[in-house]
């Protein structure tokens, strides 16, 4: 060790003595970052005069619209009176506040974009910062020492450990201030300007850059007129005027102009105008008539093609389907307005599948949403390796043509797919063991886009270290299981199967079985059936409804030792006894659009078990409150479970983000059950929860279990509350780091004499486990490898140590987790 230090310390000192500017070319300077950006002539909150004028402009614009609507019979003449009323004092103050807030938001948006243009990290930047860097610039030292090396070793060192210096000329501040100035103009700051200074440091070969931003007054939209559109298109624009992105009084923004072009294009295509494009909308702006304001005219360009001015209707559908890319489509099948060309004796994908997948209807107007749904439904089947969808005018020579034929060219994907997975585990309770799984899937199993998957899996675990007694493992366990899944790319239900939905839908039928063996304790078999329906009408909203789910858990054999454990814990006995779980559930998931800067996700899940079965018993004359009702000779579970989860990620800059999660859940057993099944209860701890503590090692409430090796079986609850926050930063290349804070616990809804302090009360909410820690992540694009070190700060029960930090020994509060994927 001493020899290693004797070698390592001089090496570090030698590198530290190296100059970071040794290899800087003559006339160049090493870029060391930017100073804090200075802002002058920042826009201030609107004065009363400005608010008055804008209010008048808005009122006049509204009045003009009202008069136009009255003349066209779209509204009553009485509306003219309300349109002519001036703003009262209360409304005036409200308008002032709105404009002041809007001005702050406008400047904040422009400021963010300008800073993004000016940002450029120096060598060894701290988390991608443009102003701060680490003092140990090893990459630069290596580059300076080996930049002119001609030997193989020197070149290898330079390639793998060297970092080229970032020069001021490479940063190109002149170009950046021009782009930043143009960015200000794009956001309505027409008089804005960005300048810079080169700040040479003590070492003349080093320099920082100081940027100065003069924002000036933001120009706002005055009157906005949509002119020269054909009458039919003008009516469409008026009918959707509430969705306009350009509004009087708001800041002029090129971004908003572009978004309005896109909105008009989508609106027209949704109403049949297939050939209308965003580029066909143009703007005329006048900034002279009223200083500080922009009078805007929105109109179509005169050079647009004539076919863009009329709606188009769907005609026939032509599908060209090949099994392989080089196949010749020598067979033809006609079904009404559908024509299918394919290779082979049978069409690989049945005609009915195409009719269900294509949302367009012959004779109806082309709609953009139908095109998007068609692409999504065909793609969701996963049976095609290639697909091209195009719309062809039926009569290109006729100026009055209005019919589009849909033409699809597609190539089938390979039929079979297999997946083999192998993993090794090392758990905090000293259980280790391997696990393997193999899944074989057949696509397009019945020529209807179906997917049939058969999966087998197995695992083996044994207790090590303190768990071993006399050379024999205290707990040997193995598990064998299988699952058969049938997925249909549509609803499969009586009376619904033949209907054509204009939205993507799936149906999953699952049959599964699982056999668990815990040597010296029990053998259990679990079997299940499930029918689940999924659909979404919008890409951001997902629905999943399980209409039927029946699980059966049966203990095949038990030992006297296990019987004693269950006798000491009645709740554990109820949750692990032989029982049926007939259930239904619904899950709603929302995910923000990908264009949103700060992404967020939320999910609500509700599940009930045994209620329908109990109603059937009630119809047969048995009381709803009667306990120990049986299904096929075994009791069935009754409970209601609800969970809610919200996740949000705030992107602070390109290399730094703040992720958060809040989770709440409750499960309430009733009727035939005193406790919910063990698998339905909540727990905290582990790699994706409170990372300072292992799985099922906290709670419920302030209950502290005995030191029994199996006490983790007691540490589940009926209620779970948890919150997590994590600061994520990109370190080097694909290597990322994180620091986190986790808090939460589980509680019982009912008192339990065997677990004092476990019940949820107003005072027990303060019994929260708290942990912090740090970790690294290696992002391989297709997979994220994660290693976290959790550090306990507070346990929810009393310990031998007083104070908020009540971890008896520091090492007792350390949790190590190796996992795949992000925790949330």
Regions found by a protein language model. Name each.
Residues 42, 197-199, 212-218, 226-231, ...:
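Solvent-exposed coil/turn segments that connect beta secondary-structure elements
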Residues 2, 19-380, 403:
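Interaction-mediating elements
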Residues 233-236, 347-348, 367-603, 691-692, ...:
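Gram-negative/organellar outer-membrane beta-barrel architecture
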Residues 340, 344, 425-429, 544-729, ...:
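C-terminal outer-membrane beta-barrel translocator/porin domains of Gram-negative envelope proteins
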Residues 2-9:
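Sec-dependent signal peptide recognition
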Residues 378, 440, 486, 604, ...:
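Hydrophobic, well-ordered secondary-structure elements that form the walls
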Residues 424-425, 442-444, 489, 753-780, ...:
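Strand-loop-strand
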Residues 15-17:
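C-terminal motif of bacterial Sec signal peptides marking the signal peptidase cleavage site
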